[in-house]
Amino acid sequence: MTLKALAQSLGITLKYLFSKPVTVPYPDAPVALKPRFHGRHVLTRHPNGLEKCIGCSLCAAACPAYAIYVEPAENDPENPVSAGERYAKVYEINMLRCIFCGLCEEACPTGAIVLGYDFEMADYEYSDLVYGKEDMLVDVVGTKPQRREAKRTGKPVKVGYVVPYVRPELEGFKAPTEGGKR
């Protein structure tokens, strides 16, 4: 190695030694997500509180990873669950199989399923990574592990991201502010 090459390599090292780090201190500082980020699935509702999902199973048919299971049922006219003739009695998404491509969102004729902003879904049990309808409704804050940790500690659900723009499809979804709180 020549003296010139040694000086160049030391110069590069010194340049990066005193520059701003590229890495983000993720757990301590919230991460700014982009508007088209694909995260945890959210099942939306109409303004009157009825579910938008009509149990048509088009999202399951569009899913290339076969991660979605929908079991439709007839809607009771006296006590409707959704605005259509049917509703999703069982709606499950296996988050281990899901590739977060967004094809389910595109296939949905009512705009019921939207890919939200939650991405912290690591868990220990396989069964905890199969999200049911009650885990994905729009008024549910955080993922299963986040809710379990909040229940254990008695603190509110803490999310590690900041969304500068909230998609209009996520009606009722409270995006966190700059401090990382909703």
UniProtKB/Swiss-Prot annotation:
One cellular-component annotation, GO: plasma membrane
Subcellular location, record wording: Cell membrane
GO-annotated biological processes: aerobic respiration
UniProtKB keywords: 4Fe-4S, Cell membrane, Iron, Iron-sulfur, Membrane, Metal-binding, NAD, Quinone, Repeat, Translocase
Pfam families: Fer4_7
Protein name: NADH-quinone oxidoreductase subunit 9
Record domain 4Fe-4S ferredoxin-type: where: 43-73, 89-118
Subunit relationships: NDH-1 is composed of 15 different subunits, Nqo1 to Nqo15. The complex has a L-shaped structure, with the hydrophobic arm (subunits Nqo7, Nqo8 and Nqo10 to Nqo14) embedded in the membrane and the hydrophilic peripheral arm (subunits Nqo1 to Nqo6, Nqo9 and Nqo15) protruding into the bacterial cytoplasm. The hydrophilic domain contains all the redox centers.
Family: Belongs to the complex I 23 kDa subunit family.
